[in-house]
Every structure is written in structure tokens, then in C-alpha cells.
Amino acid sequence: MPEVKVPELAESITEGTIAEWLKQVGDSVDKGEAIVELETDKVNVEVVSEEAGVLQELLANEGDTVEVGQAIAVVGEGSGNNTSEAPAKQEAPKQETETSTDDKSAQPAEATSNDTDDKSQDNNQRVNATPSARKYAREKGIDLSEIAAASNDVVRKEHVDQSQTQTSTQQQAQPAAKEETKKLTQQNPSKPVIREKMSRRKKTAAKKLLEVSNNTAMLTTFNEIDMTNVMDLRKRKKEQFIKDHDGTKLGFMSFFTKAAVAALKKYPEVNAEIDGDDMITKQYYDIGVAVSTEDGLLVPFVRDCDKKNFAEIEDEIGNLAKKARDKKLGLDDMVNGSFTITNGGIFGSMMSTPIINGSQAAILGMHSIITRPIAIDADTIENRPMMYIALSYDHRIIDGKEAVGFLKTIKELIENPEDLLLES
């Protein structure tokens, strides 16, 4: 019988976790239909069946870690259950038990659910939603069309969960608080704590960050940039740039990205990595831009930055950031980069020592722009908008001289942005 196996995900991803089965044993499956949602350390992916038939066996449970190439389900011939009806029938007794011990109060709620079930299913079919969201909505008896009107996008499982939480908060607040207090009291009467499992993504991130710290000779060097000229140039070019590039705004990230490319060309060791006893120097410039999301920090890559102009870089950064926050990043967006830029300044960070990303040799940290007095010469002090920048690097590949030179190049280019803009 045909087996459903974990597909090749990406070069750096060898395993994942079963987040949710979208189909159950006995359900009919179409060719190309998603049957399971798999969580990796990068993104969540839906695994599809290569054959049409009936899901006959699940070879892994939700929460299990599975490897690339591992069989996780068996699909056989025949026609299976109508999955749009099965979950509703299975959920009914569970809802009765959880919502109330009073049979009289439970009956009206059950009747209401039955009356609206057909209408909700019809509405749900017209909504643009992921398979996991449809399944979850069916189980909870939620109309996806109401959620779609609020989300203005593809409805995902978290949207359904948020909707359910909002409608039931008042009813559940008091019992939930009592239950939480009970758990905390049992653990330690005088010192309350909350214990929860880390997501796979957080566990993987923690593991990789520790590996980087343990397996590299990481060092950080600093410099500062007078942002006066680049801020003035951006202000002068802002409106014209928007007109010339169909509404694209000129931000600071494109300046730093282009400056990083120029510095990487001048100091190729910063664009390298160690592979065993070899050093691999990359001849491409795929720059990662760190994006903060609800799931933590994600680093999608802007490809071929040396071949893109300012507007193209700004567009791609904006698109990748939106995809990251909407949980729509693909694996191709997240792997095989050459260098990373992170901007702690958006959170108010004045200075930091960023940790190198994966197999890369260095990471550039941007920070807050702070106006402070600067000595222009021996007799002149002026208030200038200043930014500290940091380069964390692997000292096994990059010497201190190259690291300092790299940051100095960034500084010179940002402080003389006209040249950078003209070169682009």
C-alpha cells in the first residue's frame, strides 16, 4: 500500500514534529490533499498524499518527531468517511461533558448547533482557509465566514482559535483562574510559577544558539555611525522615490543592505563559512533580515542583493516581513543565506552583541538612533543622530583587522550615502 513519507524539506532541515493530523483513519483522501501539518524549526508545512484513497493507518502521533523520508501514514484503495460530518458527530458528547453537568442547560446549545450546522458548512466551503483551519472550525462549530471578514486574508488555525477565545473569555475566566491557582498552589504554595512546553521552534532555536556559542570562536566589535547625511538624503529623496517606484518607501535597511554587500566584497572572509577543514567563501550575496514575529525571531533572506536596486530590496524586505508575520514563509525563504542583518533599534536597543546565524561567519547589528553631543573637531561640539553598530563574527575565519575594516566600510558608506545610491 502507498505510504505517505516526510518529504525533503531543505538542506538544513532533517526532521520535524507532527503538529496536527488533518485527516483521520477511515477518511477519504484526494491526490495532492494535505493530510498532516508538520512543524519544523523554520516554518510549518503541510504534507500531502501522493495517491487518492482511504487513510488506513497513522504511523506517528501528534507531537512525535519524524525524520525526512520516514513513513508516517498508509493510504489504501476505496472510499472513506465524509470528513465534513464525522468530526461534528464525534465532538457532540465531548461538548456536553465539558460545558455543563446540567443536562437541561446542555440541550438548547446542542439544538442550536444542529440547526446551524448545514449553514456553517456551506459558508465554510466558500472561505479561503487552510485545511487545518477548516478541520478545527468544524470540530469547534465555528463559522469560518465570520472569521474571514475580520482577517482579510487566508484563515489559519490560529485565527479560529483567537475567535473562539474572544467569544468564550467571560464564561471561562473564573474557572480557568481557579484551575490555574490550584495547579500553582499544588506546586509551591508561596511561589507561583507557570510551566508550559516549549514549541519545537523555540527548542530548536535554543539548541542552535547554544551550538553556535559552543562551536564558534565568537567575538564582537563595535563602531558608531553619524546618521546625519543618510537621514537628510532620505528626507530629500523620500517623496520622489515613492513616485518613481510605485509607492515603495525608502528606508534605512536598503542602505545598510547595499553597504553590507560592498563590505562583503571588500572583505570576502566575512562571507564565508567553515566546512570541516575547508573554508567556503560564497560568491553570492543573500542577506538575511531578522523579523520579529509572534513565534520569535525569523530570518528570511533577500536573494542576490548585489543585483538589486534600493527599491527592489525595500520591496522584498517588506514582502518577506509580511509573510513572516502572516506565517506564510516557505522553506526556500529561510535557508542558504550568506550574511544577516538584525535591527535591535526598533525595540529601543542602544547596543547588543548579536549571535551568528547558523553556518554563517558574521552578523551585523543595527541599533537605536540617539541624538548626543559629538566632538566634530578640537573646538566644535554638535548634537548628532548617532547609531552604534556591532559585528559578531567567528574568529576562526575572520581576524580582528578584517572585522574592524568591515565595520569601518559600513560606517563610511552610510555616512556618505550619495555614493552608495549612485552606485546602485
From Swiss-Prot:
Under the heading InterPro entries, the entry gives: 2-oxoA_DH_lipoyl-BS (IPR003016), 2-oxoacid_dehydrogenase (IPR050537), 2-oxoacid_DH_actylTfrase (IPR001078), Biotin_lipoyl (IPR000089), CAT-like_dom_sf (IPR023213), E3-bd_dom_sf (IPR036625), PSBD (IPR004167), Single_hybrid_motif (IPR011053)
The biased composition feature labelled Low complexity covers: 162-176
PROSITE patterns given in the database record:
BIOTINYL_LIPOYL, LIPOYL, PSBD
Record's cofactor remark: Binds 1 lipoyl cofactor covalently.
The catalytic site is made up of 395, 399
**GO CC list:** cytosol; oxoglutarate dehydrogenase complex
Domain Peripheral subunit-binding (PSBD) intervals: 128-164
**Which regions are flagged for Basic and acidic residues bias?**
91-105
User: Mind telling me which SUPFAM superfamilies this protein's record contains?
Assistant: CoA-dependent acyltransferases (SSF52777), Single hybrid motif (SSF51230)
One Gene Ontology term of the biological-process aspect is: L-lysine catabolic process to acetyl-CoA via saccharopine
Residues carrying N6-lipoyllysine: 42
List its EC numbers: 2.3.1.61
What is the required cofactor set for this protein?
Answer: (R)-lipoate
Q: Reaction(s) catalyzed by this protein?
A: N(6)-[(R)-dihydrolipoyl]-L-lysyl-[protein] + succinyl-CoA = N(6)-[(R)-S(8)-succinyldihydrolipoyl]-L-lysyl-[protein] + CoA
Q: Where is this region: Disordered?
A: 76-138, 155-204
What subunit structure does UniProt give?
A: Forms a 24-polypeptide structural core with octahedral symmetry. Part of the 2-oxoglutarate dehydrogenase (OGDH) complex composed of E1 (2-oxoglutarate dehydrogenase), E2 (dihydrolipoamide succinyltransferase) and E3 (dihydrolipoamide dehydrogenase); the complex contains multiple copies of the three enzymatic components (E1, E2 and E3).
The UniProt family comment states:
Belongs to the 2-oxoacid dehydrogenase family.
NCBIfam families in alphabetical order = PRK05704.1, sucB
PANTHER family, alphabetically? DIHYDROLIPOYLLYSINE-RESIDUE SUCCINYLTRANSFERASE COMPONENT OF 2-OXOGLUTARATE DEHYDROGENASE COMPLEX, MITOCHONDRIAL, DIHYDROLIPOYLLYSINE-RESIDUE SUCCINYLTRANSFERASE COMPONENT OF 2-OXOGLUTARATE DEHYDROGENASE COMPLEX, MITOCHONDRIAL-RELATED
Q: What is this protein called?
A: Dihydrolipoyllysine-residue succinyltransferase component of 2-oxoglutarate dehydrogenase complex
The encoding gene = odhB
